[in-house]
């Protein structure tokens, strides 16, 4: 634990820094 794999925020584009993350409605990226 302790790590946050999806650290990006997103508006119109997807999430690129960590594979397997997607943009959610709160404009943050989460693991699928």
From Swiss-Prot:
| Disulfide bond entries | 6-21, 10-23, 15-29
- UniProt keyword annotations, A-Z: Disulfide bond, Knottin, Plant defense
Task: Cite a single GO BP annotation.
Answer: defense response
Say where the cross-link Cyclopeptide (Gly-Asn) occurs. Answer: 1-32
Q: Name one Pfam family in it.
A: Cyclotide
- PTM per UniProt? This is a cyclic peptide.
* Matching InterPro entries: Cyclotide
Q: What is known of its domains?
A: The presence of a 'disulfide through disulfide knot' structurally defines this protein as a knottin.
The family annotation for this protein states: Belongs to the cyclotide family. Bracelet subfamily.
Entry function: Probably participates in a plant defense mechanism.
Q: What is this protein called?
A: Cyclotide glopa B
Q: Which organism is it from?
A: Gloeospermum pauciflorum
